Amino acid sequence: MKTELLKEKYIKYELTQDDVFKHQHYIIITRSGIEKIAAIENIGIHFEIVKCETNFAAVKAIGDNGEISIETFGSALKGESYKDGNTNTWYCLEMAEKGAMSRVVLKLTGFYELGVFGEDEAEDFKKNNN
């Protein structure tokens, strides 16, 4: 059943092999896939900065598709490695925003309940880390 639902969603959102890949434990949708889904569903997203410091940022994302509105969060902590942070870049606010956007889109479209995550939600989900 889950496989059939995923297949239907891949077709509906015109996702290609470049947009989706298998992580060791999860199915991951890339940034390009998230953008396609958001455009097809006409999802509007508003961001509010919760906290922004030199090496930490938290963002609240409010997403709306005309029928449903949800709120979720994204955060980024710069560390020396992924053992003491979830990013190694200095642009924490942008990373938090990307994660929050992925989460909003996937929640509004039902991918989250199928165990699908966005590539921007965790460095461990990047394609080259598999």
Show the residue positions of the predicted features:
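Polyanion-binding surfaces on beta-sheet-dominated domains and ring/shell assemblies
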Residues: 1-130
